[in-house]
Amino acid sequence: MSNVLITGCSRGIGYELARLFAQNGHKVLALSRNDKPIKELENKNISAFPFDICSDKDFEKLEEFLKDNWGTVDILINNAGQLLNKPFLQTSRIEFEEIYKVNVFGVAELTRLLIPKMSRRGHVVTISSMGGVQGSMKFPGLSAYSSSKGAVITLTELWAEEFKETGPAFNVLALGAVQTEMLEEAFPGYKAPVSAEDMAAYIMDFAMKGQGYFNGKLLQVSISTP
């Protein structure tokens, strides 16, 4: 069984990922600022504590947990993300920076911390968005969010090249519309064709097997617009 670290687990896809991995017997460290929903699952395979991906102190807490409990990590799923749906001219520098702190800098720091704890067969899966894919349809109000999701696509390609001799593998999934609270914030009233649970099942399977077939690749996981 694998040691799986997942961020953004308080709701939506991250919550369903933690639940599914644990149900299948894997050890899960589920990280999010609000750990109450995950703890309410009362699953012995899930460890959780409040974690702010922008907090140095929380990273120190994470290092201590890994040292004392796991030692190694097999799968990292960078799922945590923050949305801002706001016209560009009304978006302040601070608001723009906040999105990048979570969606880019936090992802980079967590990945940097975990790479030395992962084997050649390990797999880092970063969750991006179709809005971050070059040439995809773009939507007003998502300048900060979609550009940050484009940044982690490029980071994934760079990491795969830099660590191609030693591993782990790095891949990025650009998701289309999934029925989550974040989708409702971005596109109020839109009904997505895919549920959070169904998407989580796909991501879990890819995280377990995808490194045998892909490295440094962007996979567009979408059947609708948006």
Across the structure, where does each feature detected by a protein language model lie?
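Conserved NAD(P)H cofactor-binding loop of Rossmann-fold oxidoreductase domains
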Residues: 79-85
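Rossmann-fold cofactor-recognition segment
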Residues: 43-57
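Conserved glycine-rich Rossmann-like NAD(P)H-binding loop of the short-chain dehydrogenase/reductase
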Residues: 24-39
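Catalytic loop of short-chain dehydrogenase/reductase
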Residues: 125-151, 156-157, 161-164
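C-terminal helical subdomain
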Residues: 172-173, 188-226
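N-terminal Rossmann NAD(P)H-binding glycine-rich loop of SDR-like oxidoreductase domains
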Residues: 10, 18
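Substrate-binding pocket helix/loop in short-chain dehydrogenase/reductase
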Residues: 87-88, 95-97
